[in-house]
């Protein structure tokens, strides 16, 4: 990214960001209304505004009046369950109140649909009357048992706030260059398709000269059938947050951004809950653990 684009992108900042404005606009505005004003304010083209609004499921103008969305991910479609599911929802809510979206992350269960900020799947459609009334239902869970003994994803080293605090305290006493050296020698790679060495990435970022640095966690599982980090996001949110905090410490960044689509409400709930508790305990925000290191998360 060029220095000019970086400057333009950070001109207004995260607290008043374009995506938030688009979300507000999708609720309160008519199709196409206000595009020029937003484009001028954020110094982007009108086509960029339109492209973003038409790309994201919850921002699309044609979806504003919808009450439910049927998953059209590849697994659900191949299972052949969605046509009848959509018909049942339309009978209950009305033909014009049911839309479609990709993918809700229930590829193992099918019959997946989204209603009023929650995802449902499997036999949940049989409880549609209770769901529409707002009654709390007991959802069937897919239970698995792990016999792993060495996997960081499965262990309990960051299973609660106290362990988070103790481990963070230890890391903040380490020299940043030593953490990078350890990462480089570990051969740890990113979780993306490129498998880029984490140590190299953090090293480059720590040496980059910039007035402001951000730590970005792209938790979007945009490809149909690719909600591969669901366990990590829903059951191990502290590990995701811990990695971002340590990254901020090492590279000299004081602000992080977690990007998750609205299609995954359980992940959003788990991460928001953890972030709020960490802020209450002083483990996110200004002068963490009485040090000169500050890091906030959005």
Each predicted region: which residue ranges?
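Feature of Fe-S/electron-transfer and energy-metabolism proteins
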Residues: 1-298
């Amino acid at each position: 990214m060029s220095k000019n684009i970086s400057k333009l992108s950070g001109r207004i900042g995260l607290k008043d960001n374009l995506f938030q404005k688009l979300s507000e606009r999708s609720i309160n505005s008519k199709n196409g209304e206000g595009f020029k004003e937003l484009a001028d304010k954020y110094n982007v083209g009108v086509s960029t505004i339109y492209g973003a609004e038409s790309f994201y499921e919850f921002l699309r103008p044609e979806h504003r009046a919808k009450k439910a969305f049927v998953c059209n991910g590849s697994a659900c479609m191949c299972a052949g369950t969605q046509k009848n599911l959509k018909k049942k929802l339309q009978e209950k809510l009305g033909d014009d109140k049911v839309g479609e979206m990709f993918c809700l992350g229930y590829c193992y269960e099918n019959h997946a649909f989204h209603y009023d900020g929650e995802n449902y799947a499997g036999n949940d459609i049989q409880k549609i009357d209770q769901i529409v009334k707002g009654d709390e239902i007991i959802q069937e869970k897919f239970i698995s048992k792990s016999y792993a003994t060495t996997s960081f994803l499965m262990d309990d080293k960051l299973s609660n706030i106290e362990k988070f605090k103790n481990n963070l305290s230890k890391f903040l006493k380490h020299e940043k260059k030593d953490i990078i050296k350890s990462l480089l020698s570990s051969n740890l790679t990113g979780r993306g398709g490129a498998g880029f060495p984490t140590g190299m990435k953090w090293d480059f970022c720590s040496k980059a000269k910039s007035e402001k640095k951000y730590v970005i966690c792209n938790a979007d599982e945009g490809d149909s059938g690719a909600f591969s980090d669901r366990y990590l996001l829903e059951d191990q949110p502290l590990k995701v947050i811990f990695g971002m905090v340590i990254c901020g410490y090492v590279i000299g960044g004081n602000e992080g951004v977690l990007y998750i689509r609205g299609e995954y409400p359980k992940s959003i709930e788990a991460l928001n809950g953890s972030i709020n508790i960490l802020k209450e305990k002083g483990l996110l925000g200004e002068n963490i653990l009485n040090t000169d290191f500050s890091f906030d998360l959005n």
